[in-house]
């Protein structure tokens, strides 16, 4: 039995990136031998085992062959003690992921992965790359993950990705979302969507986002003009401001309604917030996006523009906004929405380093409103809904007083 460290652990070690998890491939052994050695089998589709002590994954070397269209269900696998390391590595997606390291630290690199690491290329290992359409998303995700190191996709791999678009609808929603979620967690999530657009996959997988490219916005507010470009800039800014997947996904969706604006109304997009809600719902339902992420995206789509004008809003409107986004039961949601609105404001050409004043105002308004406690209302011998109504009135009055003293009086 020979064991080799493979995949991302080897790649990241060579790039001097912290290794998060380690995967191993085992050569010259059988399923029965692994079980006798105390390994626990966990793979259903092919033999994957957990080490009895480290609990790291060990997989028998295998080869695979496409037997039908689609994702994993379209493959047949063969794992045996006779399969070589080179055969196992050949089935992998990119050369930089097809490097192995033996127990002595020696590298086995039959497909020139080290060369591509040094030259910062994302390159497919073999023609078998095109057999799994998920690899289009994986390459886009690696492009986002390694963009800060200046990795690029080689033209040959880009061309192959373009030829795989027709099979993307066969992917399960779970696989699409899993790759998208990983991409949203990278330093440069906007690169993922840009790569998908460049190869034609965005129109198939995210038509609501693809429709934003070429849609103009007023140059006065959006020097970058193109709504699709602005959306990518907003996602990039959101990634700078927050690690939250929910925040980053909501920033992707925030202007989705502008794709519905009739051409004769361009570049204005009145009512694009509420108009975008059904699109967000449809997108999230199609990809089976978790409810918590979906709910934030819907709220942001509807209300993000309102925050930009927060200082001009009447106290009644501010309170209505706070209740609409349920801030007293979900206080974390307000900060998420402020961050996304800031990303929206700074995700514009020339505004990247601007201070977002409405954020400070909204936080202070919420603090003032939250200083009014339910116990201050209950003492008025009110019952039922009247308690909530009175609490709302008190909070509105507190904001009105604070706003008049700190903002309106200074403007006079």
Swiss-Prot record:
ATP binds at residues 8, 11, 92, 138, 141. Mg(2+) binds at residues 21, 23. Its cofactor is Mg(2+); Ni(2+). It catalyses: a tRNA precursor + 2 CTP + ATP = a tRNA with a 3' CCA end + 3 diphosphate; a tRNA with a 3' CCA end + 2 CTP + ATP = a tRNA with a 3' CCACCA end + 3 diphosphate. Pfam families: HD, PolyA_pol, PolyA_pol_RNAbd. Its EC number is 2.7.7.72, 3.1.3.-, 3.1.4.-. One of its GO terms (biological process) is RNA repair. Magnesium is required for nucleotidyltransferase activity. The keyword Magnesium applies. CTP binds at residues 8, 11, 92, 138, 141. Residues 227-328 form the HD domain. Keywords: ATP-binding, Hydrolase, Magnesium, Metal-binding, Multifunctional enzyme, Nickel, Nucleotide-binding, Nucleotidyltransferase, RNA repair, RNA-binding, Transferase, tRNA processing. It comes from the Bacteria. GO terms for molecular function: ATP binding; CCA tRNA nucleotidyltransferase activity; cyclic-nucleotide phosphodiesterase activity; magnesium ion binding; phosphatase activity; tRNA binding. InterPro entries: CCA_bact, HD/PDEase_dom, HD_domain, NT_sf, PolA_pol_head_dom, PolyA_RNA-bd, tRNA_CCA-adding_enzyme. Monomer. Can also form homodimers and oligomers. A single active site specifically recognizes both ATP and CTP and is responsible for their addition. Catalyzes the addition and repair of the essential 3'-terminal CCA sequence in tRNAs without using a nucleic acid template. Adds these three nucleotides in the order of C, C, and A to the tRNA nucleotide-73, using CTP and ATP as substrates and producing inorganic pyrophosphate. tRNA 3'-terminal CCA addition is required both for tRNA processing and repair. Also involved in tRNA surveillance by mediating tandem CCA addition to generate a CCACCA at the 3' terminus of unstable tRNAs. While stable tRNAs receive only 3'-terminal CCA, unstable tRNAs are marked with CCACCA and rapidly degraded. Comprises two domains: an N-terminal domain containing the nucleotidyltransferase activity and a C-terminal HD domain associated with both phosphodiesterase and phosphatase activities. HAMAP family: CCA_bact_type1 (MF_01261), CCA_bact_type2 (MF_01262). Belongs to the tRNA nucleotidyltransferase/poly(A) polymerase family. Bacterial CCA-adding enzyme type 1 subfamily. This is Multifunctional CCA protein. The gene is cca.
């Amino acid at each position: 039995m020979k064991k080799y460290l493979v995949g991302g652990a080897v790649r990241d070690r060579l790039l001097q990136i912290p290794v998060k998890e380690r995967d191993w491939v085992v050569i010259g052994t059988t399923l029965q031998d692994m079980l006798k050695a105390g390994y626990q089998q966990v793979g259903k589709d092919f033999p994957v085992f957990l080490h009895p002590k480290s609990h790291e994954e060990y997989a028998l070397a295998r080869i695979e062959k496409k037997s039908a269209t689609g994702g994993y269900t379209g493959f047949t696998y063969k794992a045996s003690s006779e399969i070589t390391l080179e055969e196992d590595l050949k089935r992998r997606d990119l050369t930089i992921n097809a490097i192995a390291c033996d127990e002595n630290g020696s590298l086995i690199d039959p497909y020139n992965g080290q060369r591509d690491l040094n030259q910062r290329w994302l390159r497919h290992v073999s023609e078998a790359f095109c057999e799994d359409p998920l690899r289009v998303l994986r390459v886009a995700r690696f492009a986002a993950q390694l963009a800060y190191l200046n990795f690029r996709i080689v033209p040959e791999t880009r061309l192959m990705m373009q030829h795989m678009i027709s099979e993307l609808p066969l992917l399960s929603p779970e696989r699409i979302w899993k790759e998208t979620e990983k991409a949203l967690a990278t330093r440069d999530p906007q690169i993922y969507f840009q790569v998908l657009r460049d190869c034609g996959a965005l129109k198939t997988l995210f038509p609501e986002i693809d429709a934003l490219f070429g849609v103009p916005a007023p140059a006065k507010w959006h020097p970058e003009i193109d709504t699709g470009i602005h959306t990518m800039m907003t996602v990039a800014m959101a990634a700078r401001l927050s690690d939250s997947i929910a925040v980053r996904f909501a920033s992707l969706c925030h202007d989705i309604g502008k794709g519905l604006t009739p051409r004769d109304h361009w570049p204005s997009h009145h009512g694009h917030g509420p108009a975008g809600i059904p699109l967000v719902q449809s997108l999230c339902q199609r990809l089976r996006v978790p409810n918590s992420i979906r709910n934030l995206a819907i709220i942001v789509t509807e209300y993000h523009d309102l925050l930009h004008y927060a200082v001009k809003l009447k106290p009644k409107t501010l309170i209505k906004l706070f209740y609409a986004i349920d801030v007293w039961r979900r206080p974390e949601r307000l900060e998420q929405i402020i961050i996304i609105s800031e990303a929206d404001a700074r995700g514009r050409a020339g505004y990247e380093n601007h201070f977002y004043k409405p954020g400070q105002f909204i936080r202070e308004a919420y603090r003032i409103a939250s200083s009014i406690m339910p116990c201050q209302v209950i003492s008025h011998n009110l019952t039922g809904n009247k308690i909530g109504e009175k609490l709302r009135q008190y909070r509105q009055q507190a904001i009105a007083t604070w706003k008049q003293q700190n903002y309106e009086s200074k403007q006079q």
